[in-house]
Amino acid sequence: MTKSTKILGLIGRAVDYSYSPLIHNTACRLLGLSYHYTVFNIADPSMIPDALRGAKALGIAGFNVTIPYKKSVVPFLDALSAEAASIQAVNTIVNEGGKLTGHNTDIAGFAAPLLPYRESIRGKTLSIFGAGGAALAAIEAFIRFFSPKEILLFVRNPEKASLLLEESGHDKSAPVRILCSDNPEIIRECRVIVNATPIGTRGNNDSPLPLDRELLHPGQIVYDMVYNPLDTPLLLAAQKAGAATISGIEMLIGQAEHSFTLWTGMQMPVKAVKESLLQEIQQ
C-alpha cells in the first residue's frame, strides 16, 4: 500500500470469513490497480450512520454490504441505482466525491449462472427460502430474466416477509406467494430451489438444510447462496438426489465482477480470479 492507494471494503457483522478481500485484491493485483480491499465489521445497526459519514470523511472509495445491513444502509445514502431502488436493498456503495450511491449487483450476479437454463425455467414455479436482501434480489432477478409462473417464498414469519416486500416497493402484480417454511411439500413441483438464508454456512448452528432432502429430485435446479463451505449440505443432498446444483461461489463472483467495474471502471479478470479463489478454498 502507498499514500495513493484507494480503500475498498466489506460492511457486515462477523464477516472475517469472507472471500471478497481475496477476490478484489487479486483482481487489482492482476490489473496493476492501486486499491486495497478489507473487512469492516460493524457490531450494531445503530453504528451504520457514523460508519458511512466516516467513509465520506476518509475518502473510502467504496464498499460491498452484506448480511445484515443490505437494507440498513439505504436511508443513509445520497442516491440509489434503479436496481437498488427496485428492492430497497444495497450490496455495493460507490463514493464519488463524497456522494454515496447505492447499487445492487446481487440481481445480475444471481441471474448469471441460471441464464443457461433460461428456456427450461420460463413459465415454471420457482422457490426461495429466506426473506432478506438476498431473497429480494433473487425475486427481482427471477421476474426480470425468467418470467416465472409463480415464485414461492418460504419464510419463518409470513407477516414479516409480507411487510418486507411491501416496504421494498415490490411490484404487487408479480406472482409471489409467501408460505411458511415448515410446510414445504409443494417444493416438489418447483423447477428451481434457492437457499437465500445463512443455513448451511460454516459455523452456523441452525439445521444444515432449509428443507427435507426427500423433496429433492432430478428435475430441479438447486441454488445455494451460501459459499462457505463450497459444498454445502444442501448442495450435497441435491447432488445425491440427481438435481442440478449451483454453488454460491457463482453468485459471489458474479456480483463481485459488477461491483469491481463500478469502483474501478475496469473489467474484472474473472477466469483468473475464480481460479485463485477455488485454489484458496481447496487448500
Swiss-Prot record:
Q: Which Cys residues form disulphide pairs? A: none
Q: Which InterPro entries match?
A: Aminoacid_DH-like_N_sf (IPR046346), NAD(P)-bd_dom_sf (IPR036291), SDH_C (IPR041121), Shikimate_DH (IPR011342), Shikimate_DH-bd_N (IPR013708), Shikimate_DH_fam (IPR022893)
Positions with a binding annotation for NADP(+): 130-134, 225, 248
Per the record, GO CC terms?
A: cytosol
Is this entry keyworded Ribonucleoprotein? no
A Gene Ontology biological process in which this protein takes part is: chorismate biosynthetic process
Q: Name one Pfam family in it.
A: Shikimate_dh_N
Q: Where is the active site?
A: 70 (proton acceptor)
Coiled coil: which residue ranges? Answer: none
Q: Which reaction does it catalyse?
A: shikimate + NADP(+) = 3-dehydroshikimate + NADPH + H(+)
The UniProt record lists the keyword Hydrolase? no
- Keyword annotations of the record: Amino-acid biosynthesis, Aromatic amino acid biosynthesis, NADP, Oxidoreductase
> Which parts of the sequence bind shikimate?
18-20, 66, 91, 106, 227
Q: Name one GO molecular function term.
A: shikimate 3-dehydrogenase (NADP+) activity
The pathway noted for it is:
Metabolic intermediate biosynthesis; chorismate biosynthesis; chorismate from D-erythrose 4-phosphate and phosphoenolpyruvate: step 4/7
Quote the EC number. 1.1.1.25
UniProt family annotation: Belongs to the shikimate dehydrogenase family.
Function description: Involved in the biosynthesis of the chorismate, which leads to the biosynthesis of aromatic amino acids. Catalyzes the reversible NADPH linked reduction of 3-dehydroshikimate (DHSA) to yield shikimate (SA).
Q: How does it assemble?
A: Homodimer.
What HAMAP family does the entry give? Shikimate_DH_AroE
Indicate what this protein is called per its UniProt record: Shikimate dehydrogenase (NADP(+))
**Originating species:** Pelodictyon phaeoclathratiforme (strain DSM 5477 / BU-1)
